[in-house]
C-alpha cells in the first residue's frame, strides 16, 4: 500500500512554491511512512549500479539518512536535507550519503525500487532531493549547466542547431506530419542529432515503409525534457513539455512511435501534467505487433539482448524486443536480464554529466554482455547504444557488433537506394 500507482511515478509539480525536497517541511506523510518502513535489508544498495561501481550513492543510506534527519530535526525543520560540502562529507557517513554528490549519481534505473521488499519508492525521493538542489540553485555543476543551456537555447540535449535536424530530415526524405499519416515518428535528441541515432531512425523508417505504414515527422521538435526532469530542473522541463504538447496538438497527432524509451516514458507519463499527450509506443512494440509481416534473417549469429531500464522496469516491455532479436539470430540472455537487468549508466541525465568516481557503469555492463560470447549486442535504446559504443571499444581487439533491434530487422529487408548521408 506504500506505492503510488505505477512504477517510479514522480509526483506532479505543485505550483510556483514547490521547489522539491529542500528541507524537512517539504517531506510528505507518504515519504515519512516509506522511510520509516525500511527493514534495512540492503537489497536496494546491493543492486544499485552506482553503489556497486564505487560511487558515493547508497540507496539504503539515503532512506536511513531521511530517518535520521526527521528524528533529529523534525518534519517542520528549515534545515537543508542535503549537505553541500561534497569533499568534507566523504569521511562523515551520514553527511556523505545525504550529499548532493550522492543524489546526483543516481541513474534512475529503478533497480532499488524493484528489489525493495516493502515497496519503498526511492526514485521520487532522490529526484525530489535533486529538484530541491537544482531549483534553489544549490547544485552547481558545469555539465549540468551546459545541458540546461543547450535545452533552452537549441531545444536538444546535444546543443546542436535545429537546422542540423532539418538537414537530416531532408536527406532522408521524411515527410512532414500533416494529419493524414497514421504515425508521427518522434526523432528525439538522439534520433535527430546523434549520428548513430540517425542510423537507427533511418533503419526503423525503412521497416515502416516495408510494412506500408504511413508516417511523418514534426516540422519542429524539441527534447521531451527528460534529462531536465530527472535532474530536477522544473522550469526547463515544463518549457519542453509545453512546447511539445502544443506542437503535437497543432499537427493533430493521434499516434506516436519512438526509438527512445526515455521519450516514451516522458511523453506517456510526465507530460500528462500539462495536457493529454497522444498515444505513444516504443518501436519494439510496433515491430513485434507486425512481426508476421517482417522477414526473418536466420543469420545464425548469437545476439545478447540488453534490457534498457526505461523500457523494461519502467514500461514492462521485455518479450517484444526479444521476439525481434530471435528473428534475426540466436537469442542469448545476459546473466542479469529482464527485471534484474543492469543499467547502462545513461539514465537520470547522467549521459550528459560524466562519470568521475569509481568504475564506469557502462563498462561493467559491457563486460558482462561480452562475457556471454555473443557475436552481437542488441539494444533497444539510443542512449544504451551510445554508452556501449564507448565501452565495447575499450574491451579487446574484436568487440561484438552493436546493433539496435531496428537495425537487426532492417538487415533482412530488400536493399533500397541510399537516401543520403545520415
Residue positions per predicted region:
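Membrane-interfacial helix-loop segments of redox and metal-homeostasis proteins
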Residues: 1-8, 297, 304, 323, ...
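The canonical Cys-X-X-Cys-His
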Residues: 41-44, 48, 112, 116
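Membrane-embedded alpha-helical bundles of multi-pass integral membrane proteins
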Residues: 1-21, 26-29, 64
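Juxtamembrane/interface segments at transmembrane-helix termini
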Residues: 1-6, 48-60, 64, 122-126
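Cofactor-cradling patches in redox/metallo enzymes
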Residues: 187-282, 310-422
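Iron-sulfur-cluster electron-transfer modules
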Residues: 26-35, 57, 61, 70-266, ...
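Catalytic cores of enzyme domains
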Residues: 1, 281, 285-286, 300-314
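Active/binding-pocket-proximal capping segment
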Residues: 54-72, 79-82, 322-328, 337-340
Amino acid at each position: 500500500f506504500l506505492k503510488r500507482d505505477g512504477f517510479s511515478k514522480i509526483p506532479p509539480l505543485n505550483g510556483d512554491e514547490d521547489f522539491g525536497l529542500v528541507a524537512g517541511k517539504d517531506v510528505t506523510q507518504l515519504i515519512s511512512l516509506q522511510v520509516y518502513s525500511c527493514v534495512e535489508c540492503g537489497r536496494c544498495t546491493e543492486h544499485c549500479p552506482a553503489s556497486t561501481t564505487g560511487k558515493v550513492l547508497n540507496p539504503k543510506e539515503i532512506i536511513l539518512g531521511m530517518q535520521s534527519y526527521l528524528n533529529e530535526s523534525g518534519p517542520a525543520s528549515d534545515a537543508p536535507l542535503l549537505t553541500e560540502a561534497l569533499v568534507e562529507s566523504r569521511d562523515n557517513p551520514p553527511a556523505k550519503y545525504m550529499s548532493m554528490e550522492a543524489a546526483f549519481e543516481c541513474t534512475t534505473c529503478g533497480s532499488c525500487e524493484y528489489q525493495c521488499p516493502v515497496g519503498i519508492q526511492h526514485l521520487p525521493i532522490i529526484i525530489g532531493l535533486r529538484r530541491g538542489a537544482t531549483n534553489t540553485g544549490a547544485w552547481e555543476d558545469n555539465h549540468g549547466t551546459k545541458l540546461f543551456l543547450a535545452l533552452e537555447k537549441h531545444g536538444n540535449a546535444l546543443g546542436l542547431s535545429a537546422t542540423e535536424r532539418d538537414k537530416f530530415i531532408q536527406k532522408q526524405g521524411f515527410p512532414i506530419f500533416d494529419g493524414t499519416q497514421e504515425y508521427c515518428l518522434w526523432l528525439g535528441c538522439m534520433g535527430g542529432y546523434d549520428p548513430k541515432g540517425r542510423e537507427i531512425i533511418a533503419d526503423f523508417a525503412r521497416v515502416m515503409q516495408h510494412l506500408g505504414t504511413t508516417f511523418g515527422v514534426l516540422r519542429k521538435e524539441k527534447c521531451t525534457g527528460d534529462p531536465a526532469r530527472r535532474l530536477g530542473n522544473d522550469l526547463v522541463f515544463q518549457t519542453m513539455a509545453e512546447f511539445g504538447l502544443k506542437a503535437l496538438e497543432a499537427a493533430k497527432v493521434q499516434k506516436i512511435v519512438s526509438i527512445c524509451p526515455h521519450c516514451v516514458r516522458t511523453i506517456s507519463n510526465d507530460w500528462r501534467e500539462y495536457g493529454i499527450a497522444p498515444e505513444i509506443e516504443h518501436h519494439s512494440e510496433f515491430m513485434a505487433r507486425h512481426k508476421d509481416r517482417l522477414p526473418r534473417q536466420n543469420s545464425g549469429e548469437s545476439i545478447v539482448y540488453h534490457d534498457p531500464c526505461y523500457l523494461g522496469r519502467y514500461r514492462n516491455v521485455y518479450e517484444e524486443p526479444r521476439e525481434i532479436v530471435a528473428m534475426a539470430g540466436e537469442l542469448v540472455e545476459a546473466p542479469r536480464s529482464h527485471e534484474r537487468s543492469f543499467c547502462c549508466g545513461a539514465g537520470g541525465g547522467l549521459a550528459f554529466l560524466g562519470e568521475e568516481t569509481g568504475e564506469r557503469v557502462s563498462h561493467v555492463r559491457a563486460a558482462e554482455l561480452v562475457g556471454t560470447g555473443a557475436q552481437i549486442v542488441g539494444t533497444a535504446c539510443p542512449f544504451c547504444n551510445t554508452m556501449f559504443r564507448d565501452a565495447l571499444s575499450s574491451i579487446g581487439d574484436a568487440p561484438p557488433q552493436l546493433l539496435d533491434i531496428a537495425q537487426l530487422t532492417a538487415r533482412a529487408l530488400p536493399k533500397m537506394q541510399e537516401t543520403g548521408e545520415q
